[in-house]
C-alpha cells in the first residue's frame, strides 16, 4: 500500500458486542475530531495544555475498567487510534494515584501503550514524509489532527504512568523490605502484583523511556533528505510548542523524586532515563532547562539519608559515551555541567547567603569534583567562592571537593611540570586547604587537616610542598582548643611519617655530616682544575728541589764573574728539557736577559761597588757573608722559580690543546662534571629538605607530648602512635618525649595502658625479620632498652621502669575495654635479653660505669616480675659485690631490696611448706649494706649527685623484706647510727673546750678549724639521722598497715586450729619464718581470732587492731620508736639547733604522727601551722605530702584541719601548689576527705601562671568530674568565692576558670544546668548591695545558663535576689546587654516579649530606684502573664510534691559548705562530721528560709 494511503487507513470496527461499551469512547473521539483553530488560524489541533485541561475529569472507576478492556482490542492490532478514543479514561487513570487502586490495570495500560508505540511511530514517519512530498510538489498539506492529538496524548500518558508506576514500585519494595526486617511477610494474593513489579523493573520501565526517546530521536527519510528531530514536523506548519518538550523533561524531573535513586544499584536506571536529558540538550537546545532540572532534586528529602549525590555520575557517563554522534552530544552535556558548576558557586550568594543549604547541595559539590574535576578546575573561581560561605557544611564539602581535585590525574606531577596553569591551580588549591586549617569553625579545621592526611596517605603531596612549612602549619593545630582538631593534626603527622619520601632515617647529626661532605664535594666540583695543569704542577713540584739548587748556583755565578750574560734564544727548548741537568743555568741566563727582569739595576751597582777589590783578586769572588747580597740572591731565585713554574704550566697546556683526542676527553669530562654537579645539588637540596622536615617535626614533638599528657583519651592514643613513630624515625627530642610519655602508665585507663604497652613493644623489643638471627634481635632489644634508660631524668625514671616491668611481667592479665578489638599477641622480653643485661651489669672490667648503671636500672623492674626475680635471687652474691663501687651501689641495693617480693607460688594459700627467701642476720650481705650505709651517711660533703637518702630508704626496705629478724636488725642499725652521731657531737664539744682552753694562737686556730669541721659534720649527719627516723616511721606505717593484715588473713585458719587443739603452731622445718610470723604463730599476743570472718567485718577488726597495736606497742619507751621519738622532739624544740636540722626534724615528726593517735592529737596544730607558715618551700612541700598518710591513719582528726590543706593550693610557691593539688587528688580519689566549698581555692590553679600547676589542676578537676557530681554541687560556691571579697580574681582569669568548669558539665543532665540558675541567683543574697563588681562576675554564669525559654523563666523567678543590684548603672548596663542579646538571637515571639518586659523592669529600677515589691519574698515579674509563681519545692522545673521534696531533704547529704563556714578563720579547725550533719539536718527541717530549702533540694 502506498505511504500516503496509510495515513488515512482506519482499523476494522469492533464487534457488535462491544458497541455499547465504546459509546463513551466514540463520543470522545467525535469531539476530538472537531477541528479547532488557534489565534493565528494555521492549524486545527489543540495544544497539549488544552488536551490536559479537557481530560481532567473524574471518570468512575467502572467506566475506566471498561474502557481499558476496550483499549486492549486496539493494542492487540497495534492500532494507535485507541489512544485518542479512550484518552479521557486513560488520563483519569494516570491522574488518580490514590483514588484508583487497581494497579494491575495500570500495568496493563503500559503494555498496551508499548504495543501501540511502534504503529504510532510509523504513522508519524509517513506523515512527515508526506508533508515534505507535498511541500516539494507545491500541493496543500492537510493537518492530521487525530495523529497530532494522538502523539500529544501518548506523550502525556507515557510520562504520567512511568512516574506513577515507578514511585509505586519503589514504595512497595521499600515496604516489603521493612516487613522482612520485622519478620512479617506478604500474603499470597499479591503474587501477581509482585510479578508485575518485577516485570516493570526489568523490562517495562525501560520500554516506556525508549518510547519517549524514539519520538525525540525520530529520523525520517524524505525527498528533502534525512530529517532529524522529525517529531517537530508533526505540528507543521505550526512550530512545535515548548510545553510538548517540557513533558519529556517533566518525566525526568518527576523520576528524580524516586527514593530508589539513592541506591547504588539504580545508577544504570538513572543513566537510562537521563538519555532524555541528553537528547533535549543536544538536539533541542534545552541546556539551561536540563541544568535547572538537576537543582530541583536538591529539595528531595530522601537525599538527606544518602551518602552521595546520585545524578552527576550518570550524566558524566552519558557525556563520555563513545558511539555514533558522540561528538555532537558530548559538547552540549559538557555545557550542562559547566552551567551546573557556575550556578553551584552562585546559588547561595547574595540574598540567599544566610539560607542554610541542604545536604544534597554539599553532596553535589563533592560529586562534581569527583566526576568532572577538569570542568571544575576550569571554573575554579566559582568553587573558591564557596569557601567564603558562612555555613560550615558548605565550606567542608568545598574543601572535600578541592582535595579530590588536588588528587586527580588532571593535576598529576607530570602534567603540572608541563603546563604552568595547572601548576598554579594546584598551588592555589593547596594554599586554601592549608588556610582553612585555621578556620573559625571547629569542624572545618578538622576537615581540612583530615583531607591533608588523606592526600598524604595517597602520596599526592608534591615534594616542594612538604618542606615549605606544611608540618609547622598543621603542627600548630596541636594547640587548638578542640580535641577533634588536635586528634586530626596528630593523625596527619603520623601519616606523614609513615608515607614520607625520605625514608626512616631522620638522624640530625648524621645528616649534618652528610650535608657538609656533599657541600665540600660540590664546591670542588664547581671549581674544576684541568688534568694538564694539575699534571704540570705536580711534575714541577716533584723536581722543585733539584731545579732550585741549580738556579741558586747559577745566580751566585752571575754575582761572582765579570762576563756579560748571554741570553738563551728560545725558552721552548729549555722547558722541553727543564728537569735535565744544567737546565737551571739556562733558566737563569734566559730570565736575567729579559727586559722585565726586576733586579737588572741592582746587580751592576753591586759589581761596581766591589770592582776595585776584584782587580787583583785571582779568585774573582765576591764575599757572600754580606746580608744584603744574601737576601738579594734569595729574591732572585724565588722570582726565577715562580716564572719557570708559570711558563712550564702554560707550555704543557698548549701541548695538550694541540691534541684532538685530549680535547674530546676534556669535553666529556666537562659534561660528566656538570652532571655530577646537578646530582650533588639535588642531593644537597634533598638533605636540606629532610633536615627542615626533621626540625619541624622536632618542634611538633613537644606540643604532641603536652597533648598526650593533658588531653582526652582519643588524642592520647593518637599521640602515643605519633611519638612512637618519631622514636623509630630518630626525630630529635623523641627520646625525651618517650620517657615523659611513659608517665601514662599510671593512668587508670585500660585503653591508654594497652596502647602504651603496644607502643613500647614496637619501640623496645625488636622483631625477628627476614634472615635475622635471634641473637641479633636480642642484642638490638638490649640496645633499645639501654638507649631508653640512658639520660633519663629522676622524674621520668619510675615511669620508664614501670613500662619495662609491664613488658617483662607476662603474668599480668590483659585488660581491654574495647571488646570488639582483637587482642594483640604480646611480645615479652626474652630470657636471652635478661641474661645479656646481667652480663653488662655485672661486668667486672674497669671502665665507664654508665652502661652498667643503665643495665642495673633496667634489671630492677625486670627483677620485680615473676620471670626476673628468680634470676635476680640467683645472682645475689655478684650483685653484693657491686655494693663496693660507690657509683653502682645504689642501683645494686635497689635490686637487693626487692628480692623478698613473694612470687606467685609463695602467695598461694597452701604455700606453708615452701621456703621464703629470707637472709640471716649474720650474713655478709648485712655487713656490706651497713658499710655502704655509713660510707654515704658520714660523708661531710653536700654533693647533689650522691643519693644518700636513697641509701637510707633502700636499706630500711631491705631489712624489712629480707631480714629473718627485723626486731634485731633495724634497732641495731639505728643504735649504730645514733652512736656515731653522738661521737660526732662529742668531738665537736671536745674541740669547743680546746678553743676555750688554748693559750697558744696556733693551737687555738687549729682547734677552731677542727671545731668548725665537726660542727658542719654534725649538722649534716644529724639531718640525715632525722631523715632516717622519718623513713623508718613511713615504712613501718606501710609495713604495719599492709603486711600485718595480709599475714593475719593468711594465718587465720591455722590460728583457729591451734586454739581448738590448745597447741602452738608447729614451725615447718623447710621454711624460714620471719620474726613477725613467729609472733603470730607462737605467742598469739598480737592478734585475736575475729568473731565475724566476713570480709567487711574482718577488715574493720584488723584496722582497729592495727591502730591499737600502734598506740600501745609501737611507742613503748624502751623500744625502737620510743627511743627515736625524743631525738626528733629535741631536734624540733632546741632553739640553738640549726634551721636545717629543725626543718628535717619537723618533717620526720610529721611522718611519725600517723603511727599514733595520741601523738597526732597533740601535734596536729603545730604540724598544720608549720605547713602553712613555714618560710622553707621544701618543708611546706614535705608536710603537704605527709598529709596523705595522716588522712589515712587519722581521718577524724584530719578533717578538723583540712581547711589548712585546701589553703595551701594558693601558696606562693608553685611547687607547694602543685604538691597540694596532687595530694587533694589522691585523697579525694580514695574518699579520704570531704569536698568543701573551699575547693574553690584549688580552682584558682586552673589559670595558674605556672604550666605544671595549671596542668595538674585541670587534670584534677577532670578526674573529679568523671567520678562524682561534686563540681555541679559546688559550682555556685566556686563562682561566689572567686568573685567576692578581697581575694577576687581578675575578670579574665575568672572567665577562664568558669569556661573550663562549664566545659566539664556539657555531658551532665540538662536539669542540673537548669537548677544552676536558681543556685547562682541565691548567691546574690549573700552579696553586699553596695558591691557592684560581684554581680558582673556572676553574670558570666547566668549568661551561659540562660540560653532557652526555661532559663529565662528561672531568671525571672529569682528577680528578688538580683534586682537590688540594678541600682548600679554599670551593673544594669551589663544585664540589659545580656537580655538584649537573648532578644536578638531568639525567633520565639513570646520569648522576645518576656525579654522586653525584663528590660523594662531593669530600666525602671535604674531610673526610679528599688521598690519594695522587687525584693519581697515570692516576687516575680511574670505574675500578670498567666505563669504561676513557683514555690521552693518546684523551683527546678520538677513535678515533685512537697512531701517528696521533704523526703529528699531528709535523705540529702550534708551541704558542701555554706558561705559563712568558708569565711571562718583558716587556723580554726572545721566542725566534726557529726556536727555538720546535725547542722544540715536542722537547716533541712526548718523551712522559714527558702534559700536553704532550695539549696538542699538541688543537692
Swiss-Prot record:
It is found in: Nucleus; Chromosome. One of its GO terms (cellular component) is dosage compensation complex. Disruption phenotype: Results in high larval lethality in hermaphrodites, and survivors exhibit a XX-specific shorter and stouter body morphology. Higher percentage of spontaneous males through X chromosome non-disjunction. Increased number of crossovers, redistribution of crossovers and a reduction in crossover interference in meiosis. Increased number of rad-51 foci in early to mid-pachytene indicating double strand break formation. Increase in X chromosome axis length indicating aberrant chromosome structure. RNAi-mediated knockdown results in chromosome segregation defects in mitosis. GO terms for biological process: cell division; chromosome segregation; dosage compensation by hypoactivation of X chromosome; meiotic chromosome condensation; meiotic chromosome segregation; meiotic sister chromatid segregation; mitotic chromosome condensation; mitotic sister chromatid segregation. InterPro entries: ARM-like, ARM-type_fold, CND1/NCAPD3, Cnd1_C, Condensin_cplx_su1. One of its GO terms (molecular function) is histone binding. Residues 1-43, 1421-1499 are annotated as: Disordered. Pfam families: Cnd1 (PF12717). Residues 1432-1446 have a biased composition (Low complexity). It comes from the Eukaryota. Expressed in somatic and germline tissues (at protein level). Required for both chromosome condensation and segregation during mitosis and meiosis and X-chromosome dosage compensation depending on its binding partners. Regulatory subunit of the condensin I complex, a complex required for conversion of interphase chromatin into mitotic-like condense chromosomes. The condensin I complex probably introduces positive supercoils into relaxed DNA in the presence of type I topoisomerases and converts nicked DNA into positive knotted forms in the presence of type II topoisomerases. Belongs to the CND1 (condensin subunit 1) family. PANTHER family: CONDENSIN, CONDENSIN COMPLEX SUBUNIT 1. Component of the condensin I complex, which contains the mix-1/SMC2 and smc-4/SMC4 heterodimer, and three non SMC subunits that probably regulate the complex: dpy-26, capg-1 and dpy-28. Within the complex, interacts with dpy-26 and smc-4. Component of the dosage compensation complex, which consist of the condensin I like components mix-1/SMC2 and dpy-27/SMC4, and the three non SMC subunits dpy-26, capg-1 and dpy-28. Within the complex, interacts with mix-1, dpy-27, dpy-26 and capg-1. Interacts with smcl-1. This is Condensin complex subunit 1. It comes from Caenorhabditis elegans. The lineage of its organism: Eukaryota, Metazoa, Ecdysozoa, Nematoda, Chromadorea. The gene is dpy-28.
